[in-house]
Curated annotation (Swiss-Prot):
Pathway: Glycolipid biosynthesis; lipid IV(A) biosynthesis; lipid IV(A) from (3R)-3-hydroxytetradecanoyl-[acyl-carrier-protein] and UDP-N-acetyl-alpha-D-glucosamine: step 6/6. This is Tetraacyldisaccharide 4'-kinase. It catalyses: a lipid A disaccharide + ATP = a lipid IVA + ADP + H(+). Belongs to the LpxK family. The lineage of its organism: Bacteria, Pseudomonadati, Pseudomonadota, Gammaproteobacteria, Enterobacterales. It comes from the Bacteria. GO terms for cellular component: plasma membrane. It holds the Pfam family LpxK. ATP binds at T55, A56, G57, G58, N59, G60, K61, T62.
């Protein structure tokens, strides 16, 4: 229903317009207060790169963060990552991730980024506190913040927006009548716009999510996902249909697709109940970091990597590395 409202297919979005106007008024006032100097943002002693969205829902932001961290690491840059830690609840903040940190403490995306990149990762509701925790423990040269485009309390040097190239901005309205956190005109002020799928427009960087080999959660064995049989697909991400479409494109045709809420807590019994005798469970890598501790032999995940095309990605990386002292 939400997808139909935000796309404009359902006329119910009109009923929510008063709330959207209020949301837009408040969010605009907050941003203006920082632009006018009425509120002060905290500036880190190292450059800060924000990777965020203009819309709610999954746009492929986390794969972009991983891509950016890995590309900078390949250039010899010491990178730290901060996040709000949605879906997690730590005993105390800021929380600096370790190999023992769980998704229940830090959230699924920070744990995934930490496991994939090995970069220092810290979470806190106040992102400045997370930055300070990393700087106190690690000699990093740059900070990447996973989400937080609208978190103006943290000053930033570069802003990158990730856009779903198929859904784009839906009906164009602020939450809750539409998907927008800020209006599309905000794109004029960011340093780069990366478009996940669909067709990129002038000045935007095209990106595709390229699936790798399926990985068994228990053994680490790898195989082409199309070789798996009797698949039940599970996706607890911002836009589950994208994952299900990826499986179809890979030649894996799920018998059943189970969409879950983004950052949803997964109980062992609930996940186990999804799979019947002789079936194979295939999930996203983000779900896998929550399920690995209680995984069964027939559970697999499909990792995806961000592939950015054209000359713009190299120019963006050069611009970012030029800020590193």
């Amino acid at each position: 229903m939400i997808a139909r409202i935000w796309s404009g297919e359902s006329p119910l979005w009109r009923l929510l317009l008063p709330l959207s106007w209020l949301y837009g008024l408040v969010s605009g006032a907050i941003r203006l207060s920082y632009k006018l100097g009425l509120k002060r943002a905290w500036r880190a002693p190292v450059p800060v790169v924000v990777v965020g969205n203009l819309t709610a829902g999954g746009n492929g932001k986390t794969p972009v963060v991983i891509w950016l961290v890995e590309k900078l690491q390949q250039r010899g840059v010491r990178v730290g990552v901060v996040s709000r830690g949605y879906g997690g609840k730590a005993a105390a903040y800021p929380l600096l991730l370790t190999p023992e940190t769980t998704t229940a403490e830090a959230g699924d995306e920070p744990v995934l980024i930490y496991q994939r990149t090995g970069a220092p990762v810290a979470v806190a509701p106040e992102r400045a506190a997370a930055v300070k925790a990393i700087l106190a423990a690690h000699n990093v040269q740059i900070i990447i913040t996973d989400d937080g485009l609208q978190h103006y309390r943290l000053a930033r040097d570069i802003e990158i927006v990730v856009i779903d190239g198929v859904r784009r901005f839906g009906n164009g309205w602020w939450l809750p009548a539409g998907p927008m956190r800020e209006r599309a005109s905000r794109l004029k002020t960011v340093d780069a716009a990366i478009v996940n799928g669909g067709v990129a427009r002038a000045g935007e960087i095209p990106m595709q999510l390229a699936p790798g080999l399926a990985v068994n959660l228990r053994t680490g064995a790898r195989c082409d996902v199309a070789q798996l049989s009797n698949i039940v697909a599970m996706a607890g991400i911002g836009h589950p249909p994208r994952f299900f479409a990826t499986l179809e494109a890979c030649g894996a045709h799920p018998q059943k697709c189970v969409p879950l809420a983004d950052h949803q807590t997964l109980a062992p019994a609930d996940v186990q109940a999804l799979v019947g005798e002789g079936q194979t469970l295939v999930m996203t890598e983000k779900d896998a970091v929550k399920c690995r501790a209680f995984a069964e032999d027939n559970w697999w995940f499909l990792p995806v990597d961000a592939h950015l095309s054209g000359e713009q990605p190299d120019k963006l990386l050069q611009h970012i590395t030029s800020l590193v002292r």
